[in-house]
Amino acid sequence: MESGHRFDAQTLHSFIQAVFRQMGSEEQEAKLVADHLIAANLAGHDSHGIGMIPSYVRSWSQGHLQINHHAKIVKEAGAAVTLDGDRAFGQVAAHEAMALGIEKAHQHGIAAVALHNSHHIGRIGYWAEQCAAAGFVSIHFVSVVGIPMVAPFHGRDSRFGTNPFCVVFPRKDDFPLLLDYATSAIAFGKTRVAWHKGVPVPPGCLIDVNGVPTTNPAVMQESPLGSLLTFAEHKGYALAAMCEILGGALSGGKTTHQETLQTSPDAILNCMTTIIINPELFGAPDCSAQTEAFAEWVKASPHDDDKPILLPGEWEVNTRRERQEQGIPLDAGSWQAICDAARQIGMPEETLQAFCQQLAS
């Protein structure tokens, strides 16, 4: 498959479902995982899209990812609930956690959902968008257990994960305002994408094993490993630390330290604490009008008319529209890794080639 090829989202979705069905996932599980991965690619976040498939296959083969498992309620207390993800697909465990949280927010006006011991839960904005679709504000603190890949401010090596932070605010007649990013300067998956493409990452994102700044993504993919840096120096580090505690410790999960280190980089275990709020609770009748007035005010001051000011979440909206029309781009290296993973789990070559022909058409 040539580099720069664009794939039809629906055909790619069918292929992903077939891959996970081949791995042993039940139909609904395969669909939920495919839904999430495709949605990440459509939103422009290829780091959390179908390029994760090889890592998931390795994690499953190593015994870290447990297929056909579900989140289990550990404790329920009114508007608060704690769930054990049971190392299930994060796309399943987080789906179940958000559904329960949204139900509780409808009932109580506010809900707090703590999920621990889940496999990789993917793009956090996806879960926030579910809350926004129900009319709710949500705040998400996420930690990555036992795979340190980010150095603290003034640190010499990795001490914690990329620890995403996410907030969404729903709007009645337009896309929700969405903040969703790793507390590292770039997501780890973006180093994987750059590595496959053979391109550097922006300056200020990485240090090598000796603590020397570099733009070479190989330092996060090949031994000896370097480290990601936090965004905005001490500010990103402080937010990452709070995500580690609120997402990890408060959820009933683990934080990253000597006793919790994982032996495999594919053993991606996430914890997430989510607060879901019905904005109607606050009795702010002018909230929507004030939000729109602010949005219009901010967007009215571009430095360059060819580079419009975007609201939080608007880039994803624009990218989603473009990729739904033109297809999902995928580089040759990533596609080869996905095909190799499909072969590893026993997908017949004729089935794989049939999908390749469909995707190439």
Swiss-Prot record:
One function term, GO molecular function aspect: (R)-4-hydroxyphenyllactate dehydrogenase (NADP+) activity
Domain of life of the native organism: Bacteria
Enzymatic reactions: 2-hydroxyglutarate + NADP(+) = 2-oxoglutarate + NADPH + H(+); 2-hydroxyglutarate + NAD(+) = 2-oxoglutarate + NADH + H(+); 3-phenyllactate + NADP(+) = 3-phenylpyruvate + NADPH + H(+); 3-phenyllactate + NAD(+) = 3-phenylpyruvate + NADH + H(+)
UniProt KW keywords: NAD, NADP, Oxidoreductase
InterPro entries per the UniProt record, alphabetical: Mal/L-sulf/L-lact_DH-like_ah (IPR043144), Mal/L-sulf/L-lact_DH-like_NADP (IPR043143), Mal/L-sulfo/L-lacto_DH-like_sf (IPR036111), Malate/L-lactate_DH-like (IPR003767)
Gene3D superfamilies: 1.10.1530.10, Hypothetical oxidoreductase yiak, domain 2, Single helix bin
Pfam family, one: Ldh_2
Binding positions for NAD(+) per the UniProt entry: 48, 122-124, 178-182, 234, 270, 313-316
Listed EC numbers: 1.1.1.-, 1.1.1.237
Function summary: Catalyzes the NAD(P)H-dependent reduction of 2-oxoglutarate, phenylpyruvate and (4-hydroxyphenyl)pyruvate, leading to the respective 2-hydroxycarboxylate in vitro. Shows a preference for NADPH over NADH as a redox partner. Do not catalyze the reverse reactions.
The family this protein is said to belong to: Belongs to the LDH2/MDH2 oxidoreductase family.
Descriptive protein name: Hydroxycarboxylate dehydrogenase B
Biological source species: Escherichia coli O157:H7
